[in-house]
Structures are given as C-alpha cells and as structure tokens.
C-alpha cells in the first residue's frame, strides 16, 4: 500500500472524496466486509479454501482494503468445492444473509452464486427499460451481495468466451421478460452444455491454465502458480485468504496496478443502496 499516487492524490484524499466515514458507500463497504468475514469463516469451518478475487485483491495491494469508489466483494472457490459450500450455506442459513442461486431465487440465472444481505436493497437507476435493470428486478433477493465464483484449471479460453456469451444472453435478453424460457435456457446450459465444455477441457485443456468456470462473465487467464495455494492477504484490517501471488495476478489483470486510473475510468456501479 502506498500513500501518494501517480495523480498526486493520497489515501486520505481518496477516502474523503469517495467513501468518507458515515457515507452510504462506506456503510455498504462495511456491511460487505462483515459478509465476507462470515463467508470465509464458514468456508474454513467446512474445509473449503475461499479467497478474495479481482478488484478486492487490487484494493488490498493498493489501498489496504476497498478501492475507495468500489461497492462489491468477489470471492472464489475451486469448482470442485463450489457446490459443497453453497449447499452448506443453504442448509445452515444466517439470520441476515442468504445464499442466492437458481434454487433459492428462480429469477437468478447465473453460473455463480451470491451471498445476499436481507437488510439492504440495491436500487438500479438504469433506464427502466434497460436489460440490466430488468435482470436486476427479476431477482427475488436484491440486497448488497458478495459474489462467489467457481474457478478451475483445464480451461479452454474460446469455449469460456462462448459460454459467457450464452449465459449473458439468457440474463440480458430473457430475464424479466420471458421467465419460463429463461429457466429452460439456464437449465439447458447448466446441466448439458457447460458440463460438455468441461469434459472437452479435461481432454484437451491446459491443466495449468486457470479461469473462472464456464458461464462466468470473465475471461482472465491465470497460471496455476499465481492462483494456488492460497496465501493470506490483509483487507480492511482483517486477514483473508488471497491468491498465491497477488502481485502477478494483479499485473496480469491490471498492468501497472499501483497507478490510479483517470477519474473518468473509475467505474462506479449504477446502484443506490437503501438500508432497511
């Protein structure tokens, strides 16, 4: 973590501009942090390695926690452990957080799961007719969430890109408009198509090439050596599992990741958070 960035901004100036104490964004970040702590503690209890991913690894390295303008947490588990973790979370529910997948929410058609907060709501301010908003409002649970992504080796990148496009089409073109068709399409991909892709990967894929599992909407290709075994990383003053080589993972995804992006590239999600 550094104090003064390439733009001349400091950690403190970023905090005051984007997520000062008491702001809605900071409250959301702290709620997400509590959810991530619970998720990792639960995973450890059942022996499932579960680590921070994506922008949260970047945030830990550059800011010691959240990227100041960020409002989400991503965690990943090995594909072979994914169902076991999800099944446990559904069988042993938290009083405030719920595991969201297609079993618990018939309007959720993604190939990953979410841990959702029941005492908040994300309200989209996208255009009412937009596909993103329809997809969001088709879901039963809409609170703050921690994404739980499966990842695996033996991936074939072009098949993953095809899988992602198929899944995106189900979510953006069918969700909220044609729920029965969306459910049929989701099940066809989940039960038939993506397992066939996985079998092809087992036969012809590179065991040292790791990606998010088939159907996730991400395409980063990472060598096995920077993914596993997990190593501890400090995030918002708490110790989480992180990737084996956080520096290499960030360089693959973001290049010179210790530099701040220009202001117009600091992505803020089009969501308002309401606490109940």
Predicted regions and their residues:
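Conserved catalytic core of two-metal-ion nucleotidyltransferases
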Residues: 9-12, 17-44, 89-155, 182-186, ...
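N-terminal beta-rich core of secreted/periplasmic extracellular enzymes
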Residues: 156-157, 170
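Conserved oxyanion/phosphate-binding beta-strand-loop segments in alpha/beta enzyme cores
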Residues: 2-7
